[in-house]
Amino acid sequence: GLIMVENVCVKYPEGSNGTTQLRLDKDCYIPRLFTLTEACHRQGALMGIQINHAGASAMSSRIGMQPVSASRFPSKAGGEIPRGLSKEEIESIAKDYGTAAKRAVNAGFDVVEIHAGHSYLISQFLSPTTNDRTDEFGGSAKNRARFCRMVIDEVRKAVGPRVPISLRLSVDELVEGGNTVEDCLEYLEYLNDEIDIYDTSAGLNASIQYQIDANYLEDGWRSYMAKAVRDKFGKPTIAIGNIRDPKIADDILARGDADLIGIGRG
């Protein structure tokens, strides 16, 4: 199987969103992560790492500065107002993702996943609910996807052609005015060529019950999102979300909704 180490910070403290969050913003973190990957490899597992920048989901009380984002929208109701990033800062952060990805490969990870969902920084650019920019990073689907495209390009340049890149995204944001499945498929047209795997999640902080699945939601309820992406682009997809019954997991795979099943609580 594939073990995914999630939510690893690419820029500290600005991009941090948790006191126990792992980091890959410095070389000093490589040795211990290499110990982890080697231990898992010895047991026959492949290792993936998910790299992330919190954006407006960071808290000034912890990071010591105003959070940053695409625009001046909080990532959740009552949250802090971030400042919009300059073009130069956007370019710099994209390079931070690439540098973190290079460190990940040096630490022995087999797959690098870019987190582009769940109201984190890339999501804040992709979603029209948090991006009202009037420059080349806002407005159209292509423009809102531009920062994500820059990140993907930097990661690909860092890891080379043989390391798979996974993209985790909120395929259906499930909020008023947010990206629908159809909107997601549109902006993925500008990202697809360098993506090897799609990790198909859902929701924003404003629809947290779909992002961190409420227990009343049916097992495998998100699989329609994995199927939509798989049907459109013909690439492997990961179905996730309340998959508690092994039979449901088998059914999702058997009917071709997804190629892989992601389970975060066994």
Regions found by a protein language model. Name each.
Residues 1-266:
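Flavin-dependent oxidoreductase catalytic cores
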